[in-house]
């Protein structure tokens, strides 16, 4: 566009005018109000604008003159019609106007977001300031005769008033600034979208009309050319024909010309219609352009007007809020200037009432030691270890009386704390409270403050460390200092005192500031949680919480690697103690809340959890949940296929039918071979669980839980398919069939427990085996029972509450033989050893290969039952355990037998399946406590056979050789 365009003056003056118009238009776009030229020229608020001039050719002088209003040399601002005309004549002017409206809307949105966020921060700051001002005002007013107290009270009141003013300003700003500007922005955005849609529709119609016009013009030209070509004809056609009548060819040409002429006329009419349509669309587009540009200009001016109005309102509100601060601080400074240091302290001293000076404290004197004739050294030490005299109180008018009648210092105290005591106000330690301030201890009457050590019933700390709301331990009938609270059986085992610092409750896992803790195990607990506490006192520091559920089986805490997890032993012992006759045990689920509480107690207290007060179904649910949430089951994943393959070979074997034939030795041998491959802890745990389920199934008539039912419950728990891609791609029918095989395998383990694992963990027999009145000890014993426990009293394991008592016949035998040695007392084990020894003698020194119950290792009697963690050796042949009375004879006989492969005593399982371990005649894979015995290997037997010939009669004639003599002999 040049200066010769219509509507602009020609020549250099026109070009200068054109530049001035552009500069004025840019100035108008960034202005803040829609006012007349006079208001824009005389408004002092808009005299300067921080935005620079956008004209690249403008100088610094021109930029300064642009924002100072119109000047005689500067450009004249354009009117609204001139702005619209300028945009209409500019290419893309409508799109530019709509884009400016969009930018204005985005700009207003950013302003609204900034002001809203700033207002929220100011509101939060005002609330926090008012909160701390209220608290500080209350604290300051509680003191008396403090310097500048009135000034700081006014300061805090000023903060409160400023906070209130800030909240009012934020509310007023939302009404006067945010809401009008947001409403105008929404209106502008709505109309902008509407105008943009109209403009796009008009442009689309115009484009369609232009395209139709071009197609009609092309068609008109083509048909006109066709008509012209057909109308001209050839020279032969113009010559007269010889024949008088028209020919057929001439007739066809005539019809073709007429048809071409008709098409040309039709194309001409269509072309003229398209021209008229295009002209109409062009006029509509111009009208729409003028209308849209005009409306956009009005919307922008209205938005600027609203923005200007709300901005002035915002500045007014902020100015009014900011003016109160300097004036108030200036007034506070004027009030603080005349203050003199020490003025309030003088008023405080004058307010005190002088009193008579207190009497001087009594002087201490040396008391010579005078021993008594009837007193023992222990009494003298007790006298010398008496408590120190109480500290004198500065506020008391007379000191507390004390005397020394010869038994140590004594004092008479008064109940309740002394008013104004420094110990009570400052909160001294337990040592100073117990020794220096006798009046701070609860209770009444005379009391000796003796610092005694902890004895399990009273704390070694001061009485004030106890909670005063819980009463005195001496006044409680139960002997507990918590008579006011209901304590569980587990809570009664703790020595509780007041909590000294913030900690976490071991019962509810909640953070607490005030509560109780145990003096011995340092267990922390809420007072309200003492009623439901399940963790017993272990008389040593309680370990940190350990996750037990959902972890790897080998990562569980144990005393030694082969130990059965304490969760399993604890739950099974409790169920066997009082729940073997409960109907539906392991089938009926417990309460979810109580089960969660028990699981949490196990993780917090480990084996110190008290289960006697819980429902048997809750305990069984905890055991099932523990086994189900293991990352790898008791039977590892890599042995799953082998066990399932073995289970598929088993036939349905109803365990309740007494006439059911025993399984084939091959099945037992294969199962033992698989069990040998289990890790030590897994094997012990599986054996313990199967033994427990055997006892549960034995009470089928009472609890209605047969071996089949228990197999259904524990099959998918003990034997789970492996996780991973293989499990994801498994066929559902196969998984369903495997569940049946899992239950069948567990049922088979329960029914045939005696043949698979042995008799070590079976319950006591109802009728003990008969005993002979005077049995004679045989020369050789194959029992793996340990020696009598009285030989080493320190090695006896503690007897659990759920363990069965000793054999009554055994006690009667002990009474009948009060002077007999342990080897002479007839017991069921000695009878069994006699039978095995006789069989050995009859066989010429060869051990008979019979069933598992008659093998060389033998089996435990039904009277033997123990839940102590033991090591069960597997695989190989054990060393022969013999009597001391026939040591030489056994050695001479063993020299003639086949070599015996010895297994180390510390080995829990063989390195691989051996023939002796795989055969049913070999070891039954029992894991029993190893007794103190002598191991006869091939080399030892060879050496013993070379002893002097006199050693054989001496060993034969002396069946009652003591163990010490035998050891010396060896």
Curated annotation (Swiss-Prot):
Residues 554-757 form the Rho-GAP domain. One of its GO terms (biological process) is small GTPase-mediated signal transduction. Keywords: Coiled coil, GTPase activation, Metal-binding, Phosphoprotein, Zinc, Zinc-finger. Residues 56-65, 231-246, 815-830, 847-863 have a biased composition (Polar residues). Residues 44-76, 224-263, 377-478, 762-878, 897-932 are annotated as: Disordered. The record marks 587 as: Arginine finger. Residues 831-844 have a biased composition (Basic and acidic residues). GO terms for molecular function: GTPase activator activity; zinc ion binding. The modification Phosphoserine is found at residues 19, 71, 231, 234, 243, 437, 441, 885, 907, 914, 919, 923. InterPro entries: AH/BAR_dom_sf (IPR027267), C1-like_sf (IPR046349), F_BAR (IPR031160), GMIP/FCHO2-like_FCH (IPR054713), PE/DAG-bd (IPR002219), Rho_GTPase_activation_prot (IPR008936), RhoGAP (IPR051025), RhoGAP_dom (IPR000198). It comes from the Eukaryota. Residues 766-778 have a biased composition (Pro residues). Residues 81-344 form the F-BAR domain. GO terms for cellular component: cytosol; nucleoplasm; plasma membrane. Stimulates, in vitro and in vivo, the GTPase activity of RhoA. Interacts with GEM through its N-terminal. This is GEM-interacting protein. It comes from Homo sapiens (Human). The gene is GMIP.
């Amino acid at each position: 566009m040049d200066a010769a365009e219509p509507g602009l003056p020609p020549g250099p003056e026109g070009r200068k005018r054109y530049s001035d118009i552009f500069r004025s238009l840019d100035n108008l776009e960034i202005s803040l109000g829609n006012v007349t030229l006079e208001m824009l020229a005389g408004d002092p608020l808009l005299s300067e604008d921080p935005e620079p001039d956008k004209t690249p050719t403008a100088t610094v002088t021109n930029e300064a003159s642009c924002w100072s209003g119109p000047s005689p040399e500067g450009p004249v601002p354009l009117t609204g019609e001139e702005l619209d005309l300028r945009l209409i004549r500019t290419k893309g002017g409508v799109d530019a106007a709509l884009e400016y409206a969009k930018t204005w809307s985005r700009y207003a949105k950013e302003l609204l977001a900034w002001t809203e966020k700033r207002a929220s921060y100011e509101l939060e700051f005002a609330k926090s300031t008012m909160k701390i001002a209220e608290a500080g005002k209350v604290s300051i007013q509680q003191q008396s005769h403090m310097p500048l107290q009135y000034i700081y009270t006014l300061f805090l009141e000023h903060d409160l008033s400023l906070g209130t003013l800030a909240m009012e300003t934020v509310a007023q700003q939302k009404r006067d600034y945010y809401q009008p500007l947001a409403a105008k922005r929404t209106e502008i955005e709505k109309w902008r979208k509407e105008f943009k849609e109209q403009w796009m529709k008009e442009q689309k119609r115009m484009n369609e009309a232009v395209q139709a016009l071009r197609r009609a013009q092309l068609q008109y030209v083509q048909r006109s050319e066709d008509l012209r070509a057909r109308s001209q004809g050839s020279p032969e056609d113009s010559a007269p024909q010889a024949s008088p009548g028209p020919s057929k060819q001439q007739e066809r040409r005539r019809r073709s010309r007429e048809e071409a002429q008709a098409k040309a006329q039709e194309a001409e009419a269509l072309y003229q219609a398209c021209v008229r349509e295009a002209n109409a669309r062009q006029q509509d587009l111009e009208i729409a352009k003028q209308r849209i540009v005009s409306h956009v200009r009005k919307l922008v001016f209205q938005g600027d007007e609203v923005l200007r109005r709300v901005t002035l309102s915002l500045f007014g509100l902020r100015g009014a809020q900011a003016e109160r601060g300097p004036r108030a601080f200036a007034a506070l400074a004027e009030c603080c200037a005349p203050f003199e240091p020490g003025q309030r302290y003088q008023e405080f001293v004058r307010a005190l009432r002088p009193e008579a000076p207190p009497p001087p404290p009594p002087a201490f004197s040396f008391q010579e030691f005078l021993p008594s004739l009837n007193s023992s050294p222990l009494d003298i030490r007790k006298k010398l270890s008496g408590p120190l005299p109480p500290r004198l109180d500065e506020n008391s008018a007379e000191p507390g009386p004390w005397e020394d009648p010869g038994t140590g210092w004594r004092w008479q105290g008064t109940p309740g704390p002394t008013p104004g005591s420094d110990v009570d106000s400052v909160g001294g330690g337990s040592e100073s409270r117990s020794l220096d301030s006798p009046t701070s201890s609860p209770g009444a009457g005379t009391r000796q403050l003796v610092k005694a050590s902890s004895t399990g019933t009273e704390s070694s700390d001061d009485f004030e460390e106890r909670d005063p709301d819980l009463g005195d331990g001496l006044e409680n009938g139960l002997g507990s200092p918590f008579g006011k609270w209901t304590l569980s059986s587990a809570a009664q085992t703790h020595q509780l005192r007041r909590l000294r610092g913030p900690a976490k409750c071991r019962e509810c896992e909640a953070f607490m500031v005030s509560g109780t803790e145990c003096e011995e195990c340092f267990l922390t607990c809420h007072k309200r949680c003492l009623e439901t506490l399940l963790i017993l006192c272990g008389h040593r520091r309680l370990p940190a919480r350990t996750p037990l559920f959902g972890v790897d089986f080998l990562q569980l805490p144990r005393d030694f690697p082969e130990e059965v997890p304490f969760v399993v032993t604890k739950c099974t012992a409790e169920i066997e103690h009082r729940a073997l006759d409960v109907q539906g045990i392991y089938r009926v689920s417990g309460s979810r809340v109580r089960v969660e509480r028990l699981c949490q107690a196990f993780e917090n207290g480990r084996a110190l959890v008290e289960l006697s007060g819980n429902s048997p179904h809750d305990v069984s649910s905890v055991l099932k949940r523990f086994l189900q949430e293991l990352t790898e089951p008791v039977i590892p994943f890599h042995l799953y296929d082998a066990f399932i393959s073995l289970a598929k070979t088993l036939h349905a074997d109803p365990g309740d039918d007494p006439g059911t034939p025993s399984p084939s030795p091959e099945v037992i041998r294969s199962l033992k071979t698989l069990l040998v491959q289990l890790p030590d802890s897994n094997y012990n745990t599986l054996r313990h669980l199967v033994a427990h389920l055997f006892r549960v199934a034995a009470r089928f008539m009472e609890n209605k839980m047969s071996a089949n039912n228990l197999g259904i419950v524990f099959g998918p728990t003990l034997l789970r398919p492996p996780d991973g891609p293989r499990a994801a791609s498994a066929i559902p029918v196969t998984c369903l069939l495997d569940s049946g095989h899992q239950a069948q395998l567990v049922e088979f383990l329960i029914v045939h427990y005696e043949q698979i694992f042995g008799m070590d963990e079976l319950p006591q027999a109802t009728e003990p085996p008969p005993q002979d009145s005077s049995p004679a000890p045989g020369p050789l014993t194959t029992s793996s029972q340990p020696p009598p426990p009285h030989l080493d009293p320190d090695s006896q394991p503690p007897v659990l509450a759920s363990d069965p008592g000793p054999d009554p016949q055994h006690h009667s035998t002990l009474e009948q033989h009060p002077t007999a040695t342990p080897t002479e007392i007839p017991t069921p084990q000695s009878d069994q050893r006699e039978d095995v020894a006789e069989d050995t003698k009859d066989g010429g020194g060869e051990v008979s290969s019979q069933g598992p119950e008659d093998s060389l290792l033998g089996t435990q009697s039904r009277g033997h039952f123990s839940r102590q963690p033991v090591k069960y050796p597997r695989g190989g042949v054990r060393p022969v355990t013999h009597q001391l009375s026939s040591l030489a004879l056994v050695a001479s006989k063993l020299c003639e037998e086949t070599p015996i492969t010895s297994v180390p005593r510390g080995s829990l399982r063989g390195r691989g399946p051996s023939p002796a371990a795989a055969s049913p005649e070999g070891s039954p894979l029992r894991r029993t406590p190893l007794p103190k015995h002598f191991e006869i290997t091939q080399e030892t037997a060879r050496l013993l056979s070379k002893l002097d010939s006199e050693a054989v009669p001496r060993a034969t004639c002396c069946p009652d050789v003591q163990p010490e003599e035998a050891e010396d002999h060896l």
